[in-house]
């Protein structure tokens, strides 16, 4: 709400609107989530039972309840954010950057449902996940080609959504000796040639340094 009142026409929550795939563990099992899991199951469960059900064996009732509770939480917060923005101006666009768990289903919801919840009656948008900096660190063993194809796959999954969709042109941590501008431009060129997405969000400025420190990404764009 405060950001909307400041005059923003578009608000995007950056990475990590998720519960799964976190550095401190796999999703949440706080008291409220534990209570909700029990409500869904119709019986009380403790954390060791949830852990065993989530992490072992085929799909089961505990894992389904855990995923449902996760999804309900994420969707409810997205709707609360939308309501706060609507109180200022329902035309303000609100959305998020998808994460790996936004597409895997493990969060109990998906990128499309979350985008609609954030968007409300405003025009929906979605940033895909998969960035050039992954190639530098070989995150999950990914090459630049793999990362490009991941974005194309997400574009396919959302092709009938009616959303404005754009790629994650992130070169974290910057500057160019960490992630060359050539990787960003190759990524952008391939996706532009492929044509599935509407554009790209290029993260070309260092988060903490002067904007005059590293100008090469902009110069190469």
Regions found by a protein language model. Give the residues of each.
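Hydrophobic targeting/anchoring helices
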Residues: 14, 89-221
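Polysaccharide-binding and catalytic clefts of secreted carbohydrate-active enzymes
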Residues: 1-149
